[in-house]
From Swiss-Prot:
It comes from Acanthamoeba polyphaga mimivirus (APMV). Keywords: Virion. It is found in: Virion. Gene3D superfamilies: Regulator of chromosome condensation 1/beta-lactamase-inhibitor protein II. One of its GO terms (cellular component) is virion component. This is Uncharacterized protein R345. It comes from the Viruses. Residues 941-984 are annotated as: Disordered.
Length: 984
């Protein structure tokens, strides 16, 4: 019983949620016991209650965190491993696999995970950042592959520094990592080499018979009879840079024997002149097994097994030059039995006998054995070890770029945010899509036409079609019964416009109706600019000559001399032929370059797409290569070796090795980038294969959206400036300690603090739904500070979703800005009254369809569409206000029920008839038919109770007389230890 009680208590302790996550179709939670529960659309089926995720035995340890992407769960366990759980895999069992393992990364354990739309970030104990999943927006590896199924380390090879002083644009220069410090590689350690061999029937040594006389030379010495056997060895050698190997070898000998037949022995004797060794041809009449190990040792528990000899094992030290062969000596056990030796004078032979097996050893042709003095024999064994190793070749020093010391990771949608210990924010991914929409939110053309204008219109009454005509009969054949179509004569109208506030010489202007209607027609024909985050103008303006008008105060540069246009077809032709097919075109600053999928059109001149077009200006100056991406469609890519602002783009540098790409299509894949690099330079691009974006040939992609034509201008206020790039991280400096970062849909909400200063909130990015809390729908490209007086006290946490941002203050109040269904609709932070401060919200999971809240005490709340059962409320009805998700509360109630059963008397426990598996959807607000409380079966309001105004009913006692006929209606009470009525 005590074990059951302890198990029930442990269940109650382990059922507290500690982490939540959600995507568009499901919700998952991790409890303090490491269990993972999920609800929603799982495996193509709707589950409207939480179910425990059955993973597999490969997940060792306890799961401590979970993050969801659009179709997967990523699990972090306390061993530092990260697993991917593909719960929608098209098979009977979901696929669980490891995407990050400390064993493969030098024991560096994962300690934190954050997830975006389809990617995940992993932070380790050593401060390294890894990523897995989608890389479509280069949110993991600049210019890398489209997707990474296993984690890849995120390396910073280059940066683009954001300059917040340019209010209308991103501008930047290459920062600290432009000239990386490459450390020298000092190789003091040895390489490790392995030697291993398994040999059979090899010569291993000799049995030495001493005090034996041989004629000639009629000297007394030692006769050595060769011994053969089976041996295997393995060892590890340390090889230095000079090719010298030292180490140890472990050997195992299973068989020793003397062969039958001809043998090559030796005779050794000493005299005054020294030691002499003479080889002898010997013959053996029979094979003698000296030692035989048990090849298949029996189990220790097998009492009937025959005992066998253990192999001869040992370890010996060896050393030598790589490529040579060294000798390893074998240590013979002290009590090792050896054959006995006798001498037959009649036959001049010696007899070796072991275990009733004899062999006669005779010297052939080379001499005769003539005398023997009995003496102990010895056994000497050794074997040859070829040193199959090589002297290490000089290795080039591994290129290591200095990496920041990472302090925090954040992710959302297609953006990855890394924060270092200097509070610099590195942003990867789709933030390059944002641009200022300030001009798009201005008044329309019609408002500009009638701005400050007093208009009066005069017209004759007969021009109004106000007559009450009878219904027209279309079937009437008589033309007289048909009404004539009414036509208004505009020449009879008069329109008078006055400008009383105008500073013009003419305070009043008269405009004819035709002029007014023509202007009105122009407004109607103009492209509509509704409040949107997309630019209305299809032109891409490039300032190519004169003063570029850079808002950052950079010096003006010399005019542009020429611009070269590439596209995919011309690049493929260039790469295949190793020579460009160039077509030169004279242009000026009013030239418009248009293109489609078939051809260029430059000032009404058609040029084939496989041509490399060189636009020649009249003035000399820095050369700029412009590449137009036709298939995406649209893009401008160029290199620059001039000074700042020679072209109206904001990423700038002063070295000719930088290649700038301006693209207003989708992101180029690695193959396209490689071809582009080859087209721009036929040099070697990669000094080290570890880095995809080498620092000697940097290609910076600047992505914007636009139309299908480019216009070159001297100066134009509509110049599109954009410097956030997907190919390298953009670095933001706020000079404040970064506390928290909310990553929304192409926007950032950063919570910063400092010594003796209250926390502040800075925002940047897309704001089409007011999610930045600035009171407008203006998308901003420079940091703006929120008014902290809006909040009741300082903000401690921020959470961003698509089109909405939540703020949690120190008083546990929850504020929100943006738009989320009918729950939130405000461009400034407003307190959410339906979220009680007593809940002390500590975490939030925000999706388009639902919001999940986690309280500090482990309570979970949710709201949303719930059409797939994502909230786990046992139904699929819409939930419009934050509602407690009582699954884990009911799970604890079930554990309490088991706890009570464990303490109850066995007879009472057996008679409850409620030992059914836990099913949360059977329970009501008070627990169900088997739960305690006033609404339970034995409570006053339960089905067996008397009710609020009644006495005890006939069914109050749950145990019937038919079960206990001797006691009638009285319940069995052993020793009166069970109180039947008020048990609960």
């Amino acid at each position: 019983m005590l074990s059951n009680v302890g198990h029930s208590i442990q269940k109650m302790i382990n059922n507290i949620p500690v982490a939540i996550t959600a995507n568009e179709t499901s919700t998952a939670a991790v409890t303090s016991g490491g269990n993972v529960y999920q609800t929603g659309l799982i495996g193509g089926k709707i589950h409207y209650s939480f179910n425990e995720v059955i993973t597999n035995e490969n997940i060792v340890g306890k799961v401590i965190d979970v993050k969801a992407t659009e179709d997967r769960l990523y699990l972090l366990n306390n061993s530092g491993s990260v697993f991917e759980y593909a719960y929608n895999a098209g098979s009977c069992s979901p696929v669980v696999r490891e995407v990050y393992s400390p064993a493969a990364c030098g024991g560096d354990k994962a300690v934190q995970i954050e997830a975006g739309r389809a990617h995940i970030l992993i932070k380790t104990e050593a401060g390294k950042i890894w990523g897995a999943g989608s890389n479509a927006q280069y949110q993991l590896v600049p210019q890398g592959q489209v997707r990474y199924d296993t984690a890849v380390e995120i390396i910073v090879t280059d940066t683009n520094l954001h300059d917040n002083e340019c209010p209308g644009s991103f501008t930047g220069v290459y920062n600290e990592l432009e000239c990386p410090v490459i450390p020298n590689c000092e190789k003091d350690k040895c390489d490790i080499s392995c030697v291993k061999e398994n040999l059979c029937d090899v010569h291993l040594g000799y049995i030495n018979v001493s005090h034996l006389a041989l004629n000639p030379p009629c000297e007394t010495g030692t006769l050595s009879v060769p011994v053969y056997g089976d041996i295997n060895y393995v060892g590890f050698l340390c090889v230095d840079n000079k090719g010298c190997a030292t180490g140890s070898v472990t050997y195992t000998i299973n068989h020793l024997y003397i062969k039958c037949g001809c043998l090559l022995g030796k005779f050794t004797h000493k005299d005054k002149c020294g030691c002499h060794v003479r080889e002898l041809n010997l013959s053996s009449t029979c094979q003698v097994n000296i030692f035989q190990a048990n090849p298949c040792p029996s189990a220790n528990t097998d009492l009937c097994a025959l005992t066998g000899s253990a192999p001869i094992t040992g370890t010996t030290q060896i050393s030598g030059k790589c490529g040579s062969c060294v000798i390893a000596n074998v240590d013979i056990p002290i009590d090792f039995p050896l054959p006995s030796v006798s001498f037959e004078a009649t036959c001049n032979t010696i007899v070796l006998e072991y275990n009733d097996c004899k062999t006669s050893i005779t010297v052939l042709c080379d001499g005769t054995l003539c005398d023997y003095c009995e003496c102990a024999t010895t056994l000497d064994l050794d074997f040859d070890v070829p040193l199959k190793c090589e002297a290490p070749k000089p290795i080039k020093p591994q290129i290591e770029l200095p990496q920041p010391c990472w302090a925090g990771i954040y992710a959302g949608y297609d953006i990855s945010v890394l924060v270092d210990n200097c509070n610099r924010i590195y942003v990867y991914g789709s933030l390059h899509n944002i641009r200022s929409n300030k001009d798009l939110l201005k008044r329309s053309c019609l408002e500009e036409l009638l701005k400050g204008t007093n208009a009066s219109i005069s017209f004759p009454a007969d021009q109004l079609n106000c007559a009450n005509h009878t219904a027209r009969n279309d079937n009437c054949k008589c033309p007289k019964c048909r009404d004539k179509a009414f036509k208004t004569d505009l020449n009879k109208f008069g329109i008078h416009l006055s400008f009383p506030n105008s500073e013009d010489e003419c305070s009043q202007k008269n405009m004819s109706v035709c002029d007014f209607l023509q202007n009105l027609k122009n407004c109607n024909d103009a492209q509509g600019c509704e409040p949107t985050c997309e630019p209305c103008d299809g032109y891409i303006y490039l300032n190519v000559a004169g003063d570029c008008g850079c808002p950052c105060g950079a010096p003006a540069s010399a005019p542009i001399g020429s611009i070269t246009l590439f596209n995919k077809k011309s690049i493929c032709k260039l790469v295949s032929q190793n020579c460009p097919d160039i077509s030169e075109v004279a242009i000026d600053v009013s030239t418009i370059v248009e293109f489609d999928l078939n051809k260029y059109c430059i000032d009404t001149r058609d040029i084939a797409l496989d041509k490399v077009v060189k636009l020649q200006f009249c003035n000399d100056g820095p050369n700029v290569n412009v590449y137009i991406d036709i298939d995406k469609p649209g893009g401008i890519k160029f290199t620059s070796n001039g000074k700042k602002c020679n072209v109206e783009f904001t990423v700038s540098a002063s070295t000719q090795n930088h290649q700038y790409i301006l693209n207003f299509g989708s992101i180029l894949d690695p193959v396209e980038l490689t071809n582009l690099k080859y087209a721009l330079s036929l040099d070697c691009y990669y000094p080290c294969p570890k880095y995809k974006n080498p620092f000697d040939t940097k290609i910076t992609n600047t992505y914007i959206r636009g139309g299908d034509h480019i216009k070159f201008v001297v100066s134009n206020p509509k110049n599109i400036r954009q410097a956030v790039t997907a190919d390298i991280p953009t670095v933001f400096r706020l000079n404040r300690r970064v506390i928290d970062v909310g990553v929304g849909y192409n926007n950032l909400t950063v919570l910063v603090g400092g010594l003796a200063c209250p926390n502040e909130i800075y925002v940047i990015g897309s704001n089409c739904h007011g999610e930045l809390g600035l009171g407008t729908n203006e998308t901003i490209v420079s940091w703006r500070q929120l008014n902290r007086c809006i909040f009741d006290c300082q903000v401690n946490r921020v959470f961003s979703g698509r089109y909405v941002t939540f703020y949690i203050t120190q008083s546990n109040n929850v504020y929100a800005a943006g738009q989320w269904k009918c729950f939130i609709n405000s461009t400034t932070p407003q307190i959410v009254k339906s979220i009680c401060p007593a809940w002390r919200i500590s975490d939030m999971a925000i999706t388009l369809n639902q919001i999940i809240l986690l309280g500090a005490d482990g309570c979970i709340f949710g709201l949303g569409d719930n059409h797939l059962g994502e909230l786990g409320l046992c139904h699929t009805d819409c939930v419009t206000k934050p509602t407690p998700i009582s699954f884990f509360y009911k799970l604890n109630n079930s554990a309490i029920k088991q706890f009570n059963d464990s303490l109850a008397h066995p007879m009472e426990r057996n008679n409850r008839k409620c030992n059914r598996p836990f099913n949360p959807c059977e329970f009501g607000n008070f627990g169900g038919p088997c739960a305690p409380g006033p609404c339970g079966p034995f409570g006053p309001f339960g089905p067996s109770g008397p009710g609020p105004n009644q006495g005890p009913g006939d069914d109050y006692n749950n145990f019937k007389s038919t079960k206990y006929p001797r006691n009638g209606y009285n319940k069995y009470q052993p020793n009166n230890r069970i109180h039947s009525r008020n048990r609960y």
